[in-house]
């Protein structure tokens, strides 16, 4: 069976459903595929197909995730839905399924619940840019005032975590009715309205090639008569021959000029996001640069040692620790291409962290790393991954 060719006619956006267990995330996911398949083509996916999500391994962590796709008038959406709460936590922290925006599903019959709050917090910590809200199961609420009350609660909760609670679109409906083909206001029209809200409110993400140039350095070579070459995969932006670049991290930041770019042993005028390149650097000795540093556009990223992070600690079954860790824990933090030792400070009132938990922590590294909010890392002990994290706030 030949695979269908992916036609890129519309801009592509990654989204996902978040919210409390049994509030209707998977039913909404199924309804989105069905209603939009009818409107714009594509495949409808049944609840069972989505609910029995296959397990995937991302950075050594097992996550169950369902991937569906659908199209609106103007966009192509890839949508992730997770069966269990733990899968959401892992997914958001590891960035296994990057989200350009989230659909927060809240049952109108129950209002916001503990996981509603936790998912909003996670979305804030890992830097999800936008949220739209679907007040589900609204057919079970007869009282219009009650619906308004739940909407107010959700907006306040979003504002508590620095989202724009006053202006975030809130769409009211019933995913189940929509899935059953009901054409009343709560049914299919509510799904269309939700997608219009997503089109309008979730911003188009910047393409990697449009960002400031950044390349994590993987290897360093000395080529006699030519100088020093650093190799790696360009993470974002473009590097042109003759441009100034900085080497950031581990030691003091150094400025140099890129005098050559090569790929597959051929010389190029430039390298761009996604390319595996070698960059020839002027006046840099082999010992001036090492794996773990980054090559970047000058002044675009800075080195830091002290930061706050949201971390998921692998369970014993995932090959993680068998025992908890405490304040002052000193593992290695693996950023991009290298390990740096760091000391963990737990939040006040948290005595210890058990395998399988997620926790907010502060980390002090022994050497600086080129860092920005949203940077992902692994926590390792002797080369074995015991946790995954994301930088939520740089301190210094």
Curated annotation (Swiss-Prot):
Residues 136-139 are annotated as: G4. GO terms for cellular component: cytosol. The gene is tuf1. Residues 60-64 are annotated as: G2. NCBIfam families: EF-Tu, PRK00049.1, PRK12735.1, PRK12736.1, small_GTP. Transmembrane segments: none annotated. It comes from the Bacteria. PROSITE patterns: G_TR_1, G_TR_2. Belongs to the TRAFAC class translation factor GTPase superfamily. Classic translation factor GTPase family. EF-Tu/EF-1A subfamily. Signal peptide: none annotated. Residues 174-176 are annotated as: G5. Residues 10-206 form the tr-type G domain. This is Elongation factor Tu 1.
